[in-house]
């Protein structure tokens, strides 16, 4: 790694002889040079704040808001994991047949969901600090691939980033050594928890995400935890009050540029370009979150009306089933019977009615027994741009 000195940090010489290598020690965020953001960046910041405010405001008027929150957390978990190469789909995540035992990628994403929930809960009890992040990391890697990488424990050895099979000498980036890591995390914690009255909270989130990714404080899971940290920062700074937002949406669509921008800050100190990219990414993600929420609410209203107008005496059970489908959009007859506490034959009749109304669709036409059904229009909204990167 070579750097053009622009206040972003220094290269540190470690060991000697054939074992010698350079690690990067980033400048503490409190000591950054004056940022010179463009007028366009300020306009994007303002637009992003307004769009996130619109999203927050919708929560007060949307029925069953908690259910939509759950789906959005799942989507963020999926998108962030896909950036790292996870091949799980949204249907995999929701399908009753794709258990964590049979699909390791599903287990990774489910753990991310649990980690988000844990982080938000911990924020109510303690400051956003290294101790909190360690607890969230322990959940993220609990019982899945990476378990051998000391979940919840800061690394005690040097790590590096580069192509598969590269050595520390040929790595494209070597994060701070152990001594510098401790100092970097202490500085980061102070920056997060000391008021920055003159700095927009979205800019703060951009800088904190960059600094965490550069510190790479764990042996595994740094990318996912770093993106989760964006949401925690926005909640911590009062921009958001919930996780009704999936910031990884645009990072995944522009994954190469996302990594290039992070690298550019380390090598050339291009903080302003990174902040502009970050703000644009969050703005586009917020726009998509608002649009999909409006579509989901519109679908709910149409489906409710369709059931009321067409199911007669079974409309009450139909409305109950709709509520179940909005939480579990992939189901089978046995699951419906158990959830509604009705007989299998009654559940089958209800499924048939929903098929005729176009609400449910069989996911596998070739199967007669144990057939699964999907709330297809609902799923299509959530699936948008959530396919794995091939």
Spans of features found by a protein language model:
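FIC/Doc superfamily catalytic core
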Residues: 1-390
């Amino acid at each position: 790694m070579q750097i053009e000195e622009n206040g972003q940090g220094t290269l540190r010489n470690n060991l000697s002889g054939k074992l010698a290598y350079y690690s990067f020690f980033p400048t503490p965020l409190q000591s950054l040079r004056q940022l010179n953001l463009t007028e366009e960046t300020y306009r994007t910041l303002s637009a992003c704040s307004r769009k996130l405010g619109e999203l927050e405001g919708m929560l007060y008027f949307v029925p069953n808001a908690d259910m939509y929150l759950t789906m959005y957390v799942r989507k963020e978990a999926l998108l962030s994991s896909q950036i790292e190469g996870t091949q799980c789909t949204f249907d995999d995540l929701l399908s009753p047949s794709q258990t964590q035992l049979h699909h390791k990628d599903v287990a990774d994403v489910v753990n991310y969901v649990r980690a988000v929930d844990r982080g938000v809960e911990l924020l109510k009890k303690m400051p956003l600090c290294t101790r909190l992040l360690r607890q969230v990391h322990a959940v993220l890697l609990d019982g899945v691939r990476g378990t051998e990488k000391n979940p919840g424990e800061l690394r005690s050895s040097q790590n590096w980033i580069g192509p598969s099979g590269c050595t520390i000498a040929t790595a494209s980036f070597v994060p701070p050594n152990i001594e510098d890591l401790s100092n970097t995390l202490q500085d980061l914690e102070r920056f997060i928890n000391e008021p920055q009255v003159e700095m927009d909270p979205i800019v703060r989130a951009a800088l904190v995400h960059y600094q965490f990714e550069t510190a790479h404080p764990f042996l595994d899971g740094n990318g996912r935890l770093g993106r989760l940290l964006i949401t925690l920062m926005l909640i911590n700074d009062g921009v958001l009050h919930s996780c009704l937002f999936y910031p990884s949406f645009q990072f995944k669509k522009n994954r190469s540029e996302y990594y290039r921008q992070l690298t550019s800050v380390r090598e050339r100190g291009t903080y302003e370009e990174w902040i502009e990219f970050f703000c644009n990414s969050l703005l586009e993600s917020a726009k998509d979150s608002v649009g999909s929420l409006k579509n989901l609410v519109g679908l709910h209203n149409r489906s409710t009306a369709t059931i009321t107008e067409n199911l007669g005496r079974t409309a009450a059970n139909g409305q109950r089933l709709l509520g179940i489908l909005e939480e579990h959009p992939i189901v089978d007859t046995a699951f419906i019977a158990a959830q509604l506490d009705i007989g299998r034959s009654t559940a089958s009749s209800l499924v048939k009615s929903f098929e005729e109304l176009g609400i449910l669709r069989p996911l596998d036409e070739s199967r007669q027994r144990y057939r699964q059904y999907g709330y297809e229009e609902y799923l299509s909204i959530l699936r948008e741009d959530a396919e794995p990167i091939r």
